[in-house]
């Protein structure tokens, strides 16, 4: 009877429920859920598993037979009951297979790839801009050179600046002649980058950047400094060999060279005085090969060939320099720009970097005075330029001995706080200031008996302590 009433109660309960209800079958298997279909004649439960087959189990309705499922589920059911945390029981992990994370590229990888692409693209763009600017400047120079040639054909005189520009553009145009071979021969234009890598000086001067120019000038300047030291040593050695002829002049020359090496600026009078001693010995005909090579490096010339070829090369360059000196003397040194001053000093074997405009003008005027007015031989002129090619480092500022160095603590010392007085000062001078009390002072100890702290013996220390205790006891008795 009780069992029948229980079944009838369940039947009424299921008929009143909505179309279908889903609840988890067991807390230990949260991924499983029972599906109950309302039917008065059929009470079966169907297990719903995520992505698995569906099996029917008899419900507790009292029916002994299990009827097969003839109805098709209209849709897949999903429950979130397995996500709820049951208190007192550990929450199990989801039995379903975790989805593989899609391989999405991170932001850093994206930025790296974009930077690489940009850098490669930027390199190509920079190279194209570089060649475009070089060819555009070359085209402008050729147009200006054509106008200069037209003026020259009509009998007009050229200035130094126009003449140098015409020579430079002609040299740049002739540098492009070897590239015609690469254009004429088929498939040979692919070797142009290799050719430029092996011979970078084959490009015209308009393709040379300022940074490359500065690096090249620094390298040549370092080489010239070493050459100047070598030439100074040769001059001192020649003076030592000819001590009998020169006499005191050899010692004066050696001392003068030492002064110049320490930073003394040579004057034109001193150079003329010492150049008269080497008129015959320092001629180009009497110079050896190492000296000729050093002079060629000083003028930035090639050092290949025999001694006669080097002498001829030096003579031709010195003649062109003399003609240039005459033009500069006519136009004036002040008419030159800074770049022109640097190039003129560099062509004459003088320093061109690390100097102001005034210093460059002084160097060039000194060269003109020696070459045109004093008629100094060209070889002696070049050797005299070695005195200007000395790497002088700035000396530290030295104070005279009378002036004392300022002390760091210049402020007025502030009196210490009272707490520090009690701890650090002696109590004897404080007690001397009291009016109603008198104390016996210790007799002064002669200075001859005072020994340093390191040599005082233990006995003397004990005697001094005993005297202090006796005096303190007497003072206490008098006070009482």
UniProtKB/Swiss-Prot annotation:
Cite the ranges annotated as topological domain Mitochondrial matrix.
197-480
> Which stretches make up the Letm1 RBD domain?
219-436
Mitochondrial intermembrane face of the membrane: 26-175
Q: Does the keyword Oxidoreductase apply?
A: no
- Where, per UniProt, does this protein localize? Mitochondrion inner membrane
InterPro entries on file: LETM1-like_RBD, LETM1/MDM38-like, LETM2_N
Annotated S-S bridges: none
Q: What is this protein called?
A: LETM1 domain-containing protein LETM2, mitochondrial
| Naturally occurring in which organism (per UniProt) | Mus musculus
Phylogenetic lineage = Eukaryota, Metazoa, Chordata, Craniata, Vertebrata
Gene it is expressed from: Letm2
């Amino acid at each position: 009877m009780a069992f029948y009433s229980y079944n009838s109660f369940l039947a009424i309960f299921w008929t009143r429920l909505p179309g279908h209800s889903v609840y988890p079958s067991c807390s230990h298997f949260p991924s499983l859920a029972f599906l109950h279909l309302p039917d008065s004649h059929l009470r079966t439960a169907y297990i719903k598993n995520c992505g698995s087959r569906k099996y029917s189990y008899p419900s507790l309705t009292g029916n002994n037979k299990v009827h097969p499922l003839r109805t098709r589920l209209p849709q897949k059911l999903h429950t979130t009951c397995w996500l709820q945390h049951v208190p007192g029981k550990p929450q199990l992990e989801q039995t379903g297979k975790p989805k593989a994370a899609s391989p999405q590229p991170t932001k850093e990888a994206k930025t790296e790839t974009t930077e690489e692409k940009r850098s490669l693209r930027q390199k190509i763009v920079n190279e194209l801009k570089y060649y475009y600017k070089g060819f555009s400047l070359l085209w402008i120079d050729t147009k200006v050179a054509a106008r200069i040639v037209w003026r020259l054909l009509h009998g007009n005189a050229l200035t130094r600046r126009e003449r140098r520009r015409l020579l430079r553009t002609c040299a740049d145009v002739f540098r492009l002649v070897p590239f015609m071979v690469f254009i004429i021969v088929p498939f040979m234009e692919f070797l142009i980058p290799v050719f430029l890598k092996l011979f970078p000086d084959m490009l015209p001067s308009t393709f040379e950047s300022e940074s490359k120019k500065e690096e090249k000038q620094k390298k040549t300047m370092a080489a010239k400094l070493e050459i100047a030291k070598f030439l100074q040593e040769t001059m001192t050695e020649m003076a030592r060999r000819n001590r009998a002829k020169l006499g005191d002049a050899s010692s004066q020359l050696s001392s003068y060279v030492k002064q110049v090496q320490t930073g003394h600026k040579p004057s034109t009078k001193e150079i003329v005085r010492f150049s008269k001693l080497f008129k015959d010995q320092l001629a180009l005909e009497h110079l050896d090969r190492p000296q000729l090579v050093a002079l060629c490096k000083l003028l930035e010339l090639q050092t290949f060939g025999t001694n006669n070829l080097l002498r001829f090369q030096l003579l031709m360059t010195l003649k062109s320099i003399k003609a240039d000196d005459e033009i500069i003397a006519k136009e004036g040194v002040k008419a030159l720009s800074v770049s022109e001053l640097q190039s003129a000093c560099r062509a004459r074997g003088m320093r061109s970097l690390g100097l102001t405009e005034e210093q460059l003008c002084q160097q060039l005027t000194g060269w003109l005075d020696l070459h045109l007015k004093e008629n100094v031989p060209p070889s002696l002129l070049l050797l005299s330029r070695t005195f200007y090619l000395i790497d002088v480092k700035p000396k530290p500022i030295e104070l005279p001995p009378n002036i004392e160095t300022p002390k760091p603590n210049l402020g007025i010392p502030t009196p210490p706080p009272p707490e520090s007085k009690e701890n650090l000062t002696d109590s004897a001078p404080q007690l001397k200031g009291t009016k109603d009390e008198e104390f016996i002072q210790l007799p002064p100890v002669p200075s001859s008996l005072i020994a340093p702290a390191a040599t005082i013996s233990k006995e003397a220390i004990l005697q001094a302590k005993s005297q202090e205790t006796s005096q303190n006891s007497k003072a206490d008795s008098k006070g009482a």
